[in-house]
Amino acid sequence: MKQITGGVCAAKGFSANGVHCGIRKNKTKRDLALIYSRIPASAAAVYTQNLVKGAPLTVTKNHIADGVAQAMICNSGNANTCNANGIEIAEQMSELLAKELKISAKDVIVASTGVIGQPLDITPIADGIPALVKGLGDHSNLACEGIMTTDVKPKEIAVEFEVDGTVCRIGGIAKGSGMIHPNMATMLVFVTTDCAISAEMLAKALKEDVKTSFNMVSVDGDTSTNDMVSIMANGLAGNTVIGTENEAFDTFCEALHTVTSYLCRMIAADGEGATKLLECIVTGAKDEGNARIVAKSVICSSLFKAAMFGADANWGRVLCAIGYSGADVDIHAVDVSFRSVKGEITVCHNGAGVPFSEEKAKEILLESEIQILIGLNSGDGNATAWGCDLTYDYVKINGDYRT
């Protein structure tokens, strides 16, 4: 397996584009994105667990109930959530795009992201769709820009892998900077692949993957109303269709996880106002479920995130987060270390503090990528979670979000 360029356009038969249609006031910001497969594709998606859901999620869930999609359209700048005519607008988006592409509206995935509770005018979207379609090409980067809101950096990746000797490709783009605390999904992620796989197995692969990828990311503890992870697989690589849990399925799942885990790191690193990527690696839990609970609890602790912003090796906040996590843990067996490119330092052993150099700890924690290593020493369960530090700028960004 190797990383390649191309994002969602790396896989055969996929093209993309992003334009400014006028939803956002800033004319330099793209606010409408499209991903298109030249043939119908197997499709699957997972959705936010927030009880308040954006209208596009309802429409998308209905559209891909048959496991088929051919295009994805997404606007940024308006969430189309809590609007009386939200479903109607989302359906209109799919119908307008389908007419321009000459495909079925039922084969369109619809997404929106932005401010909640503001009416979404269909006019700029309708006006922008012809240019969006006309400009289709190898423009994964433009589609990526079109789904961004408070994101500072675009997020895309693609990898190449082999299934039974056939070269396949899978790529993805993501949006996510704030309201990141998934239970799936709380971010927008769009994945494409030319691997031939049934809709049933595609859904199974995605559902399992998010447990250890996007559901293990947190920026601010807020679960969004709108976001989802979707995937289209058009089969143009020409491999034998993956229809069961076999070696080929395992290979596909590994490639998918390479893409999703990379996007997870990018989302966490680009958290609103963030200066540091935090990666919490838990080993030795009684099982994987307990490991995930501990890792997510630590990465979600506002006190711990603030300590990381200040490069303060306050390991007590780690133990505190472990203690209230609800995981089955022997706190007297817990070890904690911090690691970065500047080295590694142990700050806690068997649930108690150990002598360490505060100066060395600060040097380690001043880096932009920090690993929190937690050994529970109670079993074979492992997990990793991603997050970021909590800074002054997070409050500034969200205090001014609607302005």
What positions do the PLM features span?
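A structural signal for small-residue-enriched, beta-sheet-centric alpha/beta enzyme cores
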Residues: 1-88, 92, 98-403
